[in-house]
């Protein structure tokens, strides 16, 4: 679909050290690399280290910046986005997943009631609105995918901010 984009598949098995090694070798092979993606924030630390070691750790908009996106929304990703080094992250919200599961159990399942199908709203979460649908194994909450970027990375409702600031869980 995009003939001018060359996609490089470089498996790292989600391992930080492999991510670092593979990114360093890829930057050697392709010194003008334009973009990188990691399937999770934790191993993405290897990408950040490789970019730093090769002098490519540049802020968004700076000459030589490598577009950097990944998935999760951990505290480190929020930090990198707020500092301007990472472009964006697609968030997964494990805090909401757990809290909403408990909420549905307490409000409905423990009372022998069915979980209501339809709209779900809670302004406590950044995404605010979802939908409960009939799933293969029971009610399933569909939460819209959302992008964390420079415009919204400071929102205190992101799970990475809650885990770090409200719960005191340091990023390691």
Mark where each language-model region is.
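Hinge/beta->alpha junction and helix N-cap segments in small-molecule ligand-binding domains
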Residues: 1-22, 37-46, 72-74, 92-97
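Glycine-rich phosphate-binding loop signature in dinucleotide/nucleotide-binding domains
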Residues: 26-33
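Alpha-helix termini
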Residues: 1-2, 30, 54-61, 114-115
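Extracellular/periplasmic ligand-binding modules, especially the Venus flytrap/periplasmic-binding
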Residues: 39-51, 81-82, 88-115
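Venus flytrap/periplasmic-binding-protein-like
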Residues: 37-87
């Amino acid at each position: 679909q995009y003939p001018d984009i060359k996609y490089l598949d470089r498996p790292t098995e989600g391992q930080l050290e492999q991510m670092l090694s593979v990114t360093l070798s890829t930057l050697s092979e392709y010194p003008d690399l334009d973009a990188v993606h990691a399937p999770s924030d934790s191993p993405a630390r290897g990408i950040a280290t490789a970019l730093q070691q090769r002098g490519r750790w540049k802020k968004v908009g700076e000459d030589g910046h490598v577009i950097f996106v990944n998935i999760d929304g951990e505290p480190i990703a929020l930090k990198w986005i707020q500092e301007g080094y990472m472009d964006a992250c697609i968030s997964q919200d494990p805090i909401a997943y757990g809290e909403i599961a408990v909420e549905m159990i307490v409000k409905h399942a423990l009372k022998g009631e069915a979980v209501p199908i339809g709209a779900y709203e809670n302004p406590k979460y950044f995404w605010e609105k979802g939908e409960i649908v009939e799933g293969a194994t029971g009610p399933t909450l569909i939460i819209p995918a959302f992008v964390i970027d420079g415009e919204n990375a400071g929102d205190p409702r992101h799970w990475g901010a809650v885990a770090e600031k409200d719960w005191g869980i340091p990023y390691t």
